Design a protein with these regions (language model features):
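Transmembrane helix-bundle core of multi-pass membrane transporters
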Residues: 19, 135-207
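Membrane-interfacial amphipathic/re-entrant helices at transmembrane-helix boundaries
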Residues: 1-49, 95-96
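Single transmembrane alpha-helix segments in multi-pass membrane proteins
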Residues: 25-85, 102, 106, 110-125, ...
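Cytosolic-side transmembrane-helix boundaries in multi-pass membrane proteins
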Residues: 1, 219, 226, 230-233, ...
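Alpha-helical transmembrane segments of multi-pass membrane proteins, especially transporters
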Residues: 39, 43, 66-75, 97, ...
Length: 391
């Protein structure tokens, strides 16, 4: 990295921090602020989905590092539907095709997520290893599938390697008027879908029997099995749901008419959203509701970080600050865990000491005999009167 002609003084540091914390509001004119706000919300949508995907798996005691592959599978399934059915000029039919595309993408992601879940449940293979393998398998499937469909590749000037967008086929994500509220941005109804799904997952985890079983399995798999719960079923279903959520994130992102997918027939990269969902889930303590706000916060900082470059700062500063926030959040959780363990240990020691003292008291009472009862002295009886006290 080159730091030539970049701001390096302390005053510049505070200036850069103000730009970063200003987020979309540090972009200057009101029109740019509105556009940046809309884009911030749009780019937070897939991050919410991958974050909730990681969170629900973690609740079941699993680490879903395969969200990137599930994201790609959801994108692939949805684009195969949306780009092969042309509904231009028929918006009503276009909405139906869009719904179908999202559902197909979700099913693809669920099936892909079930693979590491199945190996974990049946063969006790660590899901991290299987997820890493399925990530790259998914990337190769993308290259293979779209390589068989050259008619989906954009042949326009300067667009080499990109797929056509849903703007060509008329099956883009509905905007529901949000594009008028945030003019010039990519925002669409995907954010509403993401929020509804995140809230639904939270309700499912906290208010339903199935959610309780997932959390019980995550707390103690074998204890849940002893209690009569199907640990294997819960593990497979948890990873299937996680895969479906990450896949919907990929579908919502690439079904937007303004987003192009960079297709590489030789080496398909893994999307950053699949991995960025991990810190989003960790910062939100794996709470689906909290993940919504964390994703928006991360995108808020990224938007501010994008304005740093034009002000003469290094563009990676925002990533460094977000990484520091994640580390401090992790340390705070570690500190809380340590303190809770100390309190639990102290409570056990206190209870043990009280129990020992009570047992000693019982032993003392059983060893020391009871004192004999005192005999009452009776007054002498007079021989003459037969009355007590007369002599």
């Amino acid at each position: 990295l080159s730091f030539v002609n970049e701001r390096t003084s302390i005053g510049d540091a505070f200036y850069g921090l103000s730009i970063l914390l200003g987020g979309p509001f540090s972009s200057g004119s009101a029109a740019y602020i509105v556009t940046n706000l809309g884009d911030m919300i749009f780019y937070a949508t897939p991050l919410i989905m991958t974050g909730v995907s990681v969170a629900i798996a973690y609740k079941t005691g699993l680490f879903n590092i395969g969200a990137a592959g599930q994201f790609l599978m959801g994108m692939t399934g949805s684009l195969l539907v949306a780009l092969n059915i042309n509904t231009t000029g028929n918006p009503g039919l276009g909405v139906l095709v869009w719904i179908l595309a999202v559902l197909v993408g979700a099913v693809c992601g669920m099936l892909w997520g079930m693979i590491p879940g199945f190996f974990r449940a049946v063969f006790n293979v660590n899901e991290v290893i299987v997820c890493i393998m399925t990530n790259w398998i998914a990337a190769n499937i993308v290259s293979w599938v779209f390589g068989l469909m050259p008619h989906l590749i954009n042949s326009g000037s300067g667009k080499s390697g990109y797929l056509i967008t849903t703007a060509v086929t008329g099956n883009g994500t509905p905007t529901l008027g949000l594009n008028q509220l945030f003019k010039g941005s990519y925002i669409d109804a995907g954010i509403i879908v993401a929020i509804i799904l995140a809230v639904g997952i939270h309700v499912m985890l906290t208010k339903t029997t199935f959610g309780y079983e997932l959390r019980a399995c995550g707390a103690n798999r074998y204890g849940a099995k002893y209690a009569g719960m199907s640990d294997k079923r819960n593990i497979i279903l948890s990873m299937a749901i996680a895969g479906g959520l990450a896949a919907i994130g990929g579908a919502l992102y690439y079904l937007n008419p303004g987003i192009e997918f960079k297709f590489d027939s030789a080496y398909q990269k893994l999307p950053d959203y699949g991995f960025n969902g991990i810190p989003a889930a960790l910062l939100g303590s794996n709470n689906p509701i909290a993940v919504i706000f964390v994703a928006l916060f991360i995108r808020y900082l990224n938007t501010g970080g994008g304005n740093l470059t034009s002000a003469g700062f290094n563009k990676y500063i925002a990533d460094v600050i977000i990484a520091l926030i994640i580390y401090f959040a992790g340390f705070s959780k570690l500190f809380k865990d340590i303190m809770s363990r100390r309190k639990a240990r102290a409570a056990v020691q206190t209870a043990t000491a009280n129990s020992t003292m009570a047992e000693k008291a019982k032993v003392t009472e059983s060893v020391v005999p009871d004192a004999p009862p005192k005999e009452e002295k009776q007054a002498p009886v007079s021989e003459k009167s037969g009355k007590e006290g007369d002599e």
